[in-house]
Amino acid sequence: MDFFIDATDNNARACTIKTSHSTIKTPVFMPVGTAASVKSLDTVDLRDILQTQIILANTYHLYLRPGDNVVKKLGGLHGFTGYNRSFLTDSGGFQAFSLSDISKANERGIEFQSHIDGSKHFFTPQKVLDIQYNLGSDIMMILDDLVALPATKERLALSVDRTTRWAQESIKYHKKMQAQGIGTNQNIFAIIQGGTDYEFRKKSAMELTALDFDGFAIGGLSVGEENSVMYNTVEFTTPFMPKNKPRYLMGVGTPEDLVECIDRGVDMFDCVMPTRNARNGTIFTSFGRLNIKAAKYKLDQNPIDEACSCYTCQNYTRAYLNHLYRAKELTYYRLASIHNLHYYLTLMKEAREAIEKGEYKAFKKAFYARRQS
């Protein structure tokens, strides 16, 4: 993976990431394709209509169904899906915790039950990398020890120490596998933990960045804490992350979150919000959120957003989207998801242009002004 810093504006960064499958301009938002599919969208939508360069897929879900060995036999994620740009896969640790009625972590890894059939499984640092080697993703996230907030200092200390040990195991194993010709085009990111405690965040960041990872993520945020607490934690953490490697904030978030965290030095984001909210009738626009299921849109012949150039806004009206939603037509999910993702991706493109011009402060001010007008 090649990484270049193209421009900075205070802490905001415009960078370029080159994998073996695509060139990614940052700041970048990665649509979430949990089971190797962004819900309601196909590869043509993602590649040609939305022009994405990277999407996220989920290790836990693909391990359980159809199985990572099946994906490998079918050409890895790229051959399996026909999406020939970059994939980032997470470690599956979050899902092992959140979707299992019985899950527990120990020094070796995470034991959990499948949410599909109740079968028992065990994720170790090596196991999640083996799964991701089979998936053939461009960026692999290592196993980390997740902590629900609020957490005691004892639990945070355990999480940070365990995450560091697993990171050491992961990088050692990855180097060994690459020496055998496995995963040579795959990059590996570590995940900084520590909750909202600055002491533990610094400890985790310092220990992980001493290891030879290709990039670093901030994990364990956007789990119910106040926005200001999350922003402050990100602002505290990013200075301890290498300038010459990508910085990824996991599972975040709203358009406001992205604008604020770009300002604090983050390059990469992912979240289910744009597609999940689309399916539930909430549309993101340049002037804020729009509830497309509201009765007032029944006869509205305007596009969702006059300022939007997306496929949906160029071809369909609010009235039609309102009808599709109320009729539970499957077409609604596609058109609404295309719009919401286009909004997120365009926001990232505009943020990059502002950084390149040294005008991010003005961009941020205008972003909020449009929402208050």
From Swiss-Prot:
GO terms for molecular function: metal ion binding; tRNA-guanosine(34) queuine transglycosylase activity. Keywords: Glycosyltransferase, Metal-binding, Queuosine biosynthesis, Transferase, tRNA processing, Zinc. Coiled coil: none annotated. It is an enzyme of class 2 (transferase). Substrate binds at D90, S91, G92, G93, F94, D144, Q193, G220. Zn(2+) binds at C308, C310, C313, H339. It holds the Pfam family TGT. The keyword Ribonucleoprotein does not apply. Signal peptide: none annotated. Its cofactor is Zn(2+). GO terms for cellular component: cytosol. Residues 251-257, 275-279 are annotated as: RNA binding. InterPro entries: TGT (IPR004803), TGT-like_sf (IPR036511), tRNA_ribo_trans-like (IPR002616). Its EC number is 2.4.2.29. Pathway: tRNA modification; tRNA-queuosine biosynthesis. Transmembrane segments: none annotated. The active site is at D90 (proton acceptor), D270 (nucleophile). One of its GO terms (biological process) is tRNA-guanine transglycosylation. PANTHER family: QUEUINE TRNA-RIBOSYLTRANSFERASE CATALYTIC SUBUNIT 1. Homodimer. Within each dimer, one monomer is responsible for RNA recognition and catalysis, while the other monomer binds to the replacement base PreQ1. This is Queuine tRNA-ribosyltransferase.
